Amino acid sequence: MTGLRWRGVAFVRWSEEAAPRTHVGGKAFQLQALTRLGMPVPRWFVLTTGATDAILGPVRGEIAALARCVEWDSESRGYAARIVACIRTSRWPAAVRAALLRAVEQLGGGRPLAVRSSAVEEDGRSGSYAGMFESRLGLPPDAVEAAVRECLAAGFAERVVAYRRERGERGAWPRLAIVIQEMATTRVAGVAFSADPRTG
């Protein structure tokens, strides 16, 4: 780890900075596209896979072992518990934490913030991972670090193991980035579907 990078990947990327999906995850990659089109996207930045890889460095072996597990049994639960404990309680690399806190301060604006998972595999061609990961909404700036920990920890939940089993996935565990974004103030909000999400 050197400066504000991990294996060449910057810890933080801002909305106006182009970055590959492997660095920022599916959600942030789509937000980049909307931002480039000039859409009115609330300001955001992403804690990249470089940052989360650095955080997860002490449990890299457990993550590789969990990726080989097919069932949610005592073995996979043990791996997941050690990973989650590391995320929730360990001291992060100082440069990662400093980069996050500095970016939260720069985001400013006084609006509540959203903390949203952005997996590299999320919303991809081979799978959506819809509903597998976590978001935390309406947060003050001083709650962001704890929310990042919870969103990252949720990436190793039983439902993710089950989703991978159902899809026959045996490869590397999904890599997570985390989006931190200003929340929009609206009078009316909704979601439009181009197809029935239950039947396609």
Which residues does each predicted region cover?
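Phosphate/diphosphate-binding loops
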Residues: 186-192
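Short, flexible loop/turn elements at secondary-structure junctions
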Residues: 119, 182-184, 197
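N-terminal beta-alpha lobe that positions the nucleotide/phosphoryl donor
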Residues: 1-179, 188
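Contiguous beta-strand/loop segments that form the cofactor/metal-binding neighborhood of enzyme cores
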Residues: 180, 193
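Short intrinsically disordered coil segments
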Residues: 130, 194-197
